[in-house]
Amino acid sequence: MTIAIGKSSKEPKGLFDSMDDWLRRDRFVFVGWSGLLLFPCAYFALGGWLTGTTFVTSWYTHGLASSYLEGCNFLTAAVSTPANSLAHSLLLLWGPEAQGDFTRWCQLGGLWTFVAFHGAFGLIGFMLRQFEIARSVQLRPYNAIAFTGPIAVFVSVFLIYPLGQSGWFFAPSFGVAGIFRFILFFQGFHNWTLNPFHMMGVAGVLGAALLCAIHGATVENTIFEDGDGANTFRAFNPTQAEETYSFVTANRFWSQIFGVAFSNKRWLHFFMLFVPVTGLWMSAVGVVGLAVNLRAYDFVSQEIRAAEDPEFETFYTKNILLNEGIRAWMAAQDQPHENLVFPEEVLPRGNAL
């Protein structure tokens, strides 16, 4: 019998392998390689938003109060966009605008770019987290694919749209009332509700809500009779592996209701994935179009006839007048640096007035 004496054949681990072992170790909160992007970015985005809504004014950028310190509440506080004069500057704390002065940086709107970019990369990190965990447990990456929808909307609205305009100033501020104002701005300046990409987005989101409600109700409807009571939560364990509802019964039910029904669970759930994600992506594509001021539907013939005939008016022409009113009021308020003045006689009036 021969005994081999010498070095072990096992090679010492390198830095990458050691980091990989530590990052992907089984723990209560999985970290992973994606966590190197997700956790710092999410921390800074949320921390920047809480700091801004609590302490930072928008007086120097919008002429507004926007913090709890100034008397705002949860619905009216916001981290507002930088001034229009700062264009597309990244507004780095150490950049030429703030020159390392934290107070001045906050006054100029530096927290907005800070929250926007850390938020975008945080969302991307969360998508990568879903991909990484799915790969480690041998799942398909459809969760990560689905999450590209919210990422596309965030990036298109908060980053691409203002990049197509004159500056970050025209992006939404990070606050409830601030985003509502941005929605009104989108309608007044882009007639967004008549844009077919917006229509597809609405169909996707509301259609997904309808599908979700129908699916949940159908599963509850077809639960096996496994106890004496009518209560859904009796006679079964919430963690059990066995199914407690009948797909065949659900299929019969919807075949009677509509005449058609999903033939298998895979097609049903793919459809529930496809509808909202496609809607979100279509709305994101539409916002990218608005970034370069693409028009959607303009029914000019109706506008000309309404201008010539006092008795002719449609819901479209009324909405066009409403948009003109939004622009007339919003432009002067939102862009005081332009010194816009609209005389009373040029403000829009409908034929009914």
From Swiss-Prot:
Q: EC?
A: 1.10.3.9
Reactions accelerated catalytically: 2 a plastoquinone + 4 hnu + 2 H2O = 2 a plastoquinol + O2
The record lists a plastoquinone as bound by 215, 262
Lineage top rank: taxon: Eukaryota
Q: Which HAMAP family match?
A: PSII_PsbD_D2
Please describe the quaternary structure of this protein.
PSII is composed of 1 copy each of membrane proteins PsbA, PsbB, PsbC, PsbD, PsbE, PsbF, PsbH, PsbI, PsbJ, PsbK, PsbL, PsbM, PsbT, PsbX, PsbY, PsbZ, Psb30/Ycf12, at least 3 peripheral proteins of the oxygen-evolving complex and a large number of cofactors. It forms dimeric complexes.
What's the further remark here? Answer: 2 of the reaction center chlorophylls (ChlD1 and ChlD2) are entirely coordinated by water.
Under what name is this protein listed? Photosystem II D2 protein
